[in-house]
A protein has these predicted regions:
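Short alpha-helical transmembrane segments in multi-pass integral membrane proteins
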Residues: 1-21, 77-142, 184-230
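Hydrophobic faces of transmembrane alpha-helices in multi-pass small-molecule transporters and flippases
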Residues: 5-36, 61, 65, 69, ...
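Transmembrane alpha-helix boundary and packing residues in multipass membrane permease domains
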Residues: 23, 27, 35, 39, ...
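Helix-terminus/linker motif at the lipid-water interface of multi-pass membrane proteins
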Residues: 28-61, 79-80, 117-126, 186-187
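Small-residue-rich hydrophobic transmembrane alpha-helices
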Residues: 38, 51-115, 146-168
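Membrane-helix interface segments
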Residues: 47-48, 162-163, 190-191
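Short runs within selected transmembrane alpha-helices of multi-pass transporters and secretion channels
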Residues: 67-70, 139-158, 164-176, 193-210
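Transmembrane alpha-helical segments of integral membrane proteins
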Residues: 175-184
Length: 230
């Protein structure tokens, strides 16, 4: 049989890379920043790293729930925008964010009210429990923006605009390293200064992403979408 070469559509390949590369780059940066922050946390002893691990395990439940909504947003928003149904696409985004709000009411309340219950699930070490309890109580103030940020990533991806939120997320996340160094040496709060840095950067990034959403930066201009649909 004759051999044939694949016929690449470079136009669509470019669109795929434009949507996917920012997200891939962000994942790499997040890993590198955590590698840089880990020695700072470890300077407070093994119990500090253990407490962070407990916090991340519980937060992963919130992340998993919001990731499901985020993936649904990507499909439904892209479908509706492609069909020229902008109002339906925006309604989908707003509905997903409202569900995220209800989900995170539970996590914010439980992180603040019963952090000791979460900590006791994983360890009986009193020092690790104390550090984990501080983590949950401090991070609770930004938990809604943590979940909403996951939803907003999906909303922007559905609108083929992954670059704006990725830039915000990468910059805010990268700032954690110098801010952790500064907070540890100037705030005299010990390990809590690192947890506070995590909270502040999540809050700032979430507020900026929300502002971009309400400014309709999550999709291409309507006239451009109409041309693509035509």
């Amino acid at each position: 049989m004759p051999k044939t070469r694949p016929n690449w559509n470079w136009h669509y390949a470019g669109k795929i890379f434009a949507v996917g590369l920012p997200l891939s780059f962000a994942s790499i940066v997040f890993s590198l920043i955590y590698m840089a922050i880990s020695p700072i946390i470890n300077s407070f002893g093994p119990s500090a790293i253990a407490a962070l691990g407990i916090g991340h395990r519980i937060e992963s439940i919130n992340y998993t729930l919001c990731s499901g909504l985020s993936m649904a947003c990507i499909t439904m928003i892209a479908h509706n925008l492609g069909a020229g149904c902008f109002a339906r696409a925006k309604a989908t985004a707003v509905k997903a964010l409202s569900w995220c709000f209800y989900i995170n009411i539970f996590f914010v309340a439980s992180f603040w009210l019963i952090p000791d219950v979460y900590a006791s699930f994983f360890t009986s070490d009193p020092e690790v429990q104390a550090n984990a309890i501080k983590y949950f109580k401090i991070i609770a103030f930004s938990e809604f923006f943590y979940g909403a940020g996951t939803i907003l990533d999906g909303i922007f991806a559905g609108g083929s605009r992954t670059l704006p939120p990725t830039l915000v997320n990468v910059i805010c996340f990268a700032l954690r390293w110098p801010l952790c160094l500064w907070a540890v040496s100037h705030l005299n709060l010990g390990l809590s200064s690192i947890w506070l840095t995590f909270t502040v950067t999540t809050l700032v990034g979430g507020l900026i992403n929300f502002a971009m959403f309400f400014m309709d930066w999550w999709h291409k201009p309507l006239n451009q979408m109409e041309e693509n649909a035509a």
